[in-house]
Amino acid sequence: MTAATAPDGRRMLRLEVRNAETPIERKPGWIKTTARMGPEYQALQQLVKTEDLHTVCQEAACPNIYECWEDREATFLIGGSQCTRRCDFCQIDTGKPADYDTDEPRRVADSVRRMGLRYATVTGVARDDLPDEGAWLHAETVRRIHADNPGTGVEILATDFSGNPDLLAEVFSSRPEVFAHNVETVPRIFKRIRPAFRYERSLDVITQARDAGLITKSNLILGMGETRDEVSEALVDLHDAGCDIITVTQYLRPSPRHLPVARWVRPEEFVEIKAEAEAIGFLGVLAGPLVRSSYRAGRLYAQSMRAKGRELPEGLAHLADPANGFAQAVG
């Protein structure tokens, strides 16, 4: 794929053509990682290779793979490789998804078992083509991982299911350790960047999850045209909606077809934002240039449980152990 073509030979959208007029930006020197391959990472890498397992971590070339795999955490994508919605920052392509695969929950749970994961994040594409928008698939994947891996925590990073309380209730009923729904950006530019989503609806999804008794989580991506004051306002909105955990990251442009980077946020601003979010009252906060919403997810879950005065389930007490890894994403 070049700057002038789109995946699978489809025509470029007018927005993509306009985006492609701006060359890919050169990253500043502070956005870098070192490939520190600890023993747990190397063991997982070998297992994934020999067992033909698939995670978002390696397929999206996540910069935090060395650290997360060292802590036996990984992320899986369900529902297919194509999304029925298009967000201008997201590398997942938009199109007609593949047929519904009812065996996927079993396969994901089996991968979790074979990888010996301590904590698994499950995310899915939007499936507006389905009557339940993929709610059963999300819920069943959580249920199957829990059933087959009682010592593994599960976080679901979900679409908004159009805000439908019945569909959301199906997902909530699977009782993930954390329910995450990412707002990603601020109200003023939300519709331009996420045209199929609605800011207030996303906040309401988080509120519904909170009311269902779940630990809740969201993410903000900086560098897409927001102002610093708007970041503060979005943090307050999310906390007021019932969000327990927040991650904040730098936008990195996936290809010339995607939204150009508006600004590079310096590390000291992320430190400032983290302190601000903690002062607002979030129970768990990670902010940094290479933080991703699933980064150190098990640690943030354990931290939030302690802050709420809740006991970690006996089978998940290991998530409160001193963290392994190298903490590159926040530096």
Swiss-Prot record:
[4Fe-4S] cluster 1 binds at C57, C62, C68, S294. Belongs to the radical SAM superfamily. Lipoyl synthase family. Its cofactor is [4Fe-4S] cluster. Pfam families: LIAS_N, Radical_SAM. Residues 69-283 form the Radical SAM core domain. Binds 2 [4Fe-4S] clusters per subunit. One cluster is coordinated with 3 cysteines and an exchangeable S-adenosyl-L-methionine. It is found in: Cytoplasm. It comes from Clavibacter michiganensis subsp. michiganensis (strain NCPPB 382). Pathway: Protein modification; protein lipoylation via endogenous pathway; protein N(6)-(lipoyl)lysine from octanoyl-[acyl-carrier-protein]: step 2/2. The gene is lipA. Keywords: 4Fe-4S, Cytoplasm, Iron, Iron-sulfur, Metal-binding, S-adenosyl-L-methionine, Transferase. This is Lipoyl synthase. It comes from the Bacteria. PROSITE patterns: RADICAL_SAM (PS51918). Its EC number is 2.8.1.8. GO terms for molecular function: 4 iron, 4 sulfur cluster binding; lipoate synthase activity; metal ion binding.
